[in-house]
Amino acid sequence: YGTTAMVPTTLTSTNEELMTTFTVYRKAKEMNINGSQFIGLHLEGPYFSPKQCGAQDPNFLKKPQAEEYNAILEASKDIIRWSVAPELEGALALGQTLQQHHILPSIAHTDAIYEEVEKAFTAGYTHVTHLYSAMSSVTRKNAFRYAGVVEAAYLIEDMTVEIIADGIHLPKPLLQFVYKFKGVDKTALCTDAMRGAGMPDGESILG
């Protein structure tokens, strides 16, 4: 399908399942001879907004706690990106910690407003995962309108974005809009494919 690099991505789950993922990733990377290059792990959650959980299991959503995420970082050196809702209590401190570990803090599954994204950007959140998917746009509270994550992604010039470029998650006009206003140098394309991709019709497991 033309995918040149693969970043296996987790879903919200128990910490025990996460540790299993770390072990499986290392084994799969050793066995991967002819496929897309494995370039690291992407942790998607569990620090997400319940209002924007999307396909994530809401039962496992939580706020960042230093003791927990430091243990996770200690358990795997393969993590290259961690997607978080930056408005959550403790998220900015997590972003700074990730930077110290040379891990990209990214914004996802979030109900943040523009001002919160600005603060997050200074704390290291310089990337948006799956732009437009499960994140805030313009909202209205008490008769006032607030710009959201989508608007912040465009207005913060050095913010990079990732879009699911399968032609289904985003229609062609939005893909063109992202390309026009963020440009090729600040836009990453991903498949967001799960294990059923390329398989015959039938049941498959997500995660």
Task: Explain the meaning of each model-derived region.
Residues 21-24, 65-67, 142-149:
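Charged helix-capping and loop-helix junction motifs
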Residues 1-20, 36-49, 76-87, 103-106, ...:
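Divalent metal-dependent hydrolysis catalytic cores, especially in the metallo-beta-lactamase
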Residues 14-20, 87-89, 102-114, 164-181, ...:
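Active-site glycine- and acidic-residue-rich loops that bind
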Residues 26-29, 95-102, 179:
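Surface-exposed amphipathic alpha-helices with a cationic face
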Residues 30-36, 75, 100-101, 182-183:
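Short helix-capping segments at alpha-helix termini
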Residues 116-207:
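Active-site-adjacent C-terminal substructures of enzyme catalytic domains
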Residues 49-74:
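Conserved phosphate-binding/catalytic loop of the ribokinase/pfkB sugar-kinase fold
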Residues 71, 79-139:
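Extended, charged catalytic domains and RNA/DNA-binding interfaces, predominantly
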